[in-house]
UniProtKB/Swiss-Prot annotation:
Belongs to the maximin-S family. Maximin-S1 has no antimicrobial activity. Has no hemolytic activity. Maximin-S2 has an activity against mycoplasma but has no activity against common Gram-positive and Gram-negative bacteria nor fungi. Has no hemolytic activity. This is Maximins-S type A. Expressed by the skin dorsal glands. The modification Lysine amide is found at K188, K223.
Length: 235
């Protein structure tokens, strides 16, 4: 499922970082944002010409909040994306996730994975996803790197591959990786109904034209198999 280059805005959640360091992070985020510019709703686009005043303010607010200790990115992102923007289909899918979310021991990522497939993914994509899900539960498994390798090698443009490699490298920088943090936040039944709703909202918006590296990686978690080519890439 293609989607407007999802929010690859890297936030420093831990405290004690210098102001100059925070500014660097914001600049890096803006660089990612520029890569993702395309048609359709795209929260992460902070470019003034592309967003309404309200969207600009919400985006800027999220960037500033990113330096606050204990910042809950997902909750604030929900407020930016959900207000009056969901279609009936999006609402139905979100409702399903909300219902699932009330179950004890709910694994949000797994349910989101199921919702992602739901007639929207090819058999090849579904198989890759299922394998990644299984691998992801193994101790010592480098989930993000494996996922990035599966989706980038020989399949992405030079710019997209560069972004993938950049994300892998960031994993070892100062112990911070926004994408990993977000996945951890989504797992283990700790998300609210609103968080779950947001996830499905983002998934359904994937029908918009444009490439979204983050969503493609998440989509790879949906049901299914890996093609021979993808299996080779993963070895």
């Amino acid at each position: 499922m293609n989607f407007n280059y999802f929010i690859l805005v890297l936030f420093f959640i831990t405290s004690g970082h210098a102001k100059s360091e925070t500014r660097d992070v914001h600049q890096e985020a803006e660089n990612h944002i520029k890569r993702g510019s395309n048609t359709g709703f795209n929260f992460k686009t902070l470019d003034k010409e592309k967003r309404s005043a309200e969207e600009q303010n919400l985006a800027e607010d999220l960037v500033k909040r990113g330096s606050n200790k204990g910042f809950n990115f997902m909750v604030d992102m929900i407020q930016a994306l959900s207000n009056g923007k969901r279609s009936a289909e999006e609402q139905d899918l979100a409702e399903d996730l909300v219902t699932r979310g009330s179950n004890k021991g709910f694994n949000f990522m797994v349910d989101m994975i199921n919702a992602l497939s739901n007639g929207k993914r090819s058999a090849e994509e579904q198989d890759l996803a299922e394998d990644l899900v299984k691998r992801g539960s193994n101790k010592g498994f480098n989930f993000m790197v494996d996922m990035i390798n599966a989706l980038s090698n020989g399949k992405r443009s030079a710019e997209e591959q560069d972004l993938a490699e950049d994300l892998v490298t960031r994993r070892s920088n100062k112990g911070f990786n926004f994408m990993v943090d977000m996945i951890q936040a989504l797992s283990k039944g700790k998300r609210s109904a609103e968080d779950q709703d947001l996830a499905e909202d983002l998934v359904t918006r994937g029908s918009n034209k444009g490439f979204n590296f983050m969503v493609d990686m998440i989509q790879a978690l949906s049901k299914g198999k890996r093609s021979a080519e993808q299996e080779k890439d993963m070895k």
